[in-house]
Amino acid sequence: MVREKVKVSTRTLQWRCVESRRDSKRLYYGRFILSPLMKGQADTIGIAMRRALLGEIEGTCITRAKSENIPHDYSNIVGIQESVHEILMNLNEIVLRSNLYGARNAIICVQGPGYITARDIILPPSVEIIDNTQHIATLTESIDLCIGLKIERNRGYSLKILNTFEDRSYPIDAVFMPVQNANHSIHSYGNGNGKQEILFLEIWTNGSLTPKEALHEASRNLINLFIPFLHVEEETFYLENNQHHVTLPLFPFHNRLVNLRKKKKELAFQYIFIDQLELPPRIYNCLKKSNIHTLLDLLNNSQEDLIKIEHFHIEDVKKILDILEKKIEKAFQKKID
């Protein structure tokens, strides 16, 4: 455990870790301070940081299990001490660390009798287990057990949908939250107009990230959220129908759209559906699942918004931009002709 005496700067805004400890493989704690802050600033930063820590940081979880030996998720299997439901719950508790994009597969293949732990999971190279001792199941007889696993990286919660799967695979409730808890408190000092504040941040993580890493990632996410506001005046325009506002924060062909707009005063983006854009099936399905149905819906999303869509990549955004540039140019040309 590392603990420091709190020394506060009275001039330059600084942050520092004043306490750091590892309670177990799956529980880290960190305490940080930021000072000096003007009255009210500590609460503003503390609330935003806590929400970013709990809701904006991505984690890696097992989201699905598949085995030919499992008839349904509340069954019992001869030779296994735990019920299928208990095994799924144990898999849900496995803490993973990764830099995944998209989904990956893993597998457990064990011959009994014996104990199955996280150490028995055969993982792809981009994924690591935080605690190899986490219990999964106990084989009481000489049986073979093979379980296929699906691993994903995401944020927030993913609740399983109750359904019967013909391929004998079962969804697992996933909590993609490396930060288990975060608190902030404020200490005020000084008098009158010179009153200042110190912000204290406490962070508990599951071991897949250290509190310091979580703090850095939450800070980057908050910064990225505010960046578009720095360019809002230059990168916003209004259509002439006075009903629809289109924002193109980072689209590289924005200036070209503005120039074309001078030649023709109205193009009904809200009546152009993404079905007409001839997008690749995977990109089309991702947009539909995100309630993006028209060109207007699409243009109201920044590149950052699109990248946040599940299973979306920067290459997909580039593909969309190429297609849109050609389609919109052709549409404007028809209007001009």
Swiss-Prot record:
The N-terminal domain is essential for RNAP assembly and basal transcription, whereas the C-terminal domain is involved in interaction with transcriptional regulators and with upstream promoter elements. Its main location: plastid. The keyword Repressor does not apply. It is found in: Plastid, Chloroplast. Keywords: Chloroplast, DNA-directed RNA polymerase, Nucleotidyltransferase, Plastid, Transcription, Transferase. Belongs to the RNA polymerase alpha chain family. Residues 267-337 are annotated as: Alpha C-terminal domain (alpha-CTD). It holds the Pfam family RNA_pol_A_bac. In plastids the minimal PEP RNA polymerase catalytic core is composed of four subunits: alpha, beta, beta', and beta''. When a (nuclear-encoded) sigma factor is associated with the core the holoenzyme is formed, which can initiate transcription. Residues 1-233 are annotated as: Alpha N-terminal domain (alpha-NTD). Its EC number is 2.7.7.6. DNA-dependent RNA polymerase catalyzes the transcription of DNA into RNA using the four ribonucleoside triphosphates as substrates. GO terms for molecular function: DNA binding; DNA-directed RNA polymerase activity; protein dimerization activity. SMART domains: RPOLD. GO terms for biological process: DNA-templated transcription. GO terms for cellular component: chloroplast; DNA-directed RNA polymerase complex; mitochondrion. This is DNA-directed RNA polymerase subunit alpha. It comes from the Eukaryota. InterPro entries: DNA-dir_RNA_pol_insert, DNA-dir_RNA_pol_RpoA/D/Rpb3, DNA-dir_RpoA, RBP11-like, RNAP_asu_C, RNApol_insert_sf.
